[in-house]
Amino acid sequence: MFVPVVNQKQEPLMPTTPSRAKRWIESGKATPFFKKGIFCVRLNVEPSNQETQEVAVGIDPGSKKEGFTVKSLAHTYLNIQTDAVTWVKDAVEIRRNMRKGRRFRNTPCRTNRMNRKRGGLSPSTKARWQWKLRICNQLKKIFPIEVFVVEDIKAKTFKNKIKWNTSFSPLEVGKNWFYTELEKLGKVELKQGYETKELRDLLGLQKIKEKTAEVFEAHCVDSWVLASSWVGGK
């Protein structure tokens, strides 16, 4: 277990141990605070050493659960499994039906407005990838992160079938938008699914089939392997 540390300018430094953080707080050298449920300390004095090691974030996207790991060569600082955003599609449908009801009451012969089409991501797709980006933004504020290692998921296509994802996929558009925004925070390294499996087998780790289970072997095992593939360590 480690405690994230930031300096007086809110810049992230290398995490410290809980015992050292406690001594800093008791002596007045640091102030405790919480950042999205994570206990952190803010230094009130000039740090003796501001050098940072290479820290990577492993990201394992999923349809129901997602894994995030913050790791350096020597230590694993954070392993979290979050719930993916799955409620936006139903919320948008309810909003659409209520709006349709209001329009029918007021203007029963209303014609379609064909000049209001807009580009961009659909609300449900945008919410899914914005959620991942917000988590990465919060981690970047408390850890000296240099690189994000992401498993590059693919959309399923159907040969000789007229499906919406044969020529267009919200998944592909959403992840490309996410990668573009993530590059503003640091270096982005992509790994294919089979590469993640090879790395996992090389380290002798197992992944369970129950992806919604609240255990390390569900999603965090892959996010840990992805981060470890960049910085190394065990």
Regions found by a protein language model. Name each.
Residues Q53-S72:
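Gly/Thr-rich phosphate-binding beta-strand-loop-beta motif of the actin/hexokinase/Hsp70
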Residues Q50, K71-K234:
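Substrate-contacting helices/loops that form the catalytic groove of nucleic-acid
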Residues M1-T17, G28:
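Low-complexity, highly charged intrinsically disordered N-terminal segments
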Residues T16-E51:
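Charged, flexible boundary elements
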